[in-house]
Amino acid sequence: MDRLVYIVDKSGKLYVGITTDIDNRLRQHGNPPLLHKEGPMINVEAVNRERQIKGWNREKKQSLCEKMPEKQM
C-alpha cells in the first residue's frame, strides 16, 4: 500500500510521520496544520525519508515545508 510522509505543526513542534490515509491521520492528531507531504511511495522509501527528515534541524524542516506548492495541500 502506498504511503505518504507528512509534517504537521503540533503544539508548536514539527511532527514528521507516515500514513496511508492523510485525512484520517490528521483527525487523529487533532487536525493540526499540514505543512508538507510527499508521496505516494512504497513503505521502505517512506520509512527512509521519514528517518532522514526526523534527523534534520527545525530550520531545514521549515525550509522543506516552504517549498511545497499550495495545490498539494
Where are the model-predicted features located?
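GIY-YIG nuclease catalytic motif and its immediate N-terminal context
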Residues: 1-51, 58-73
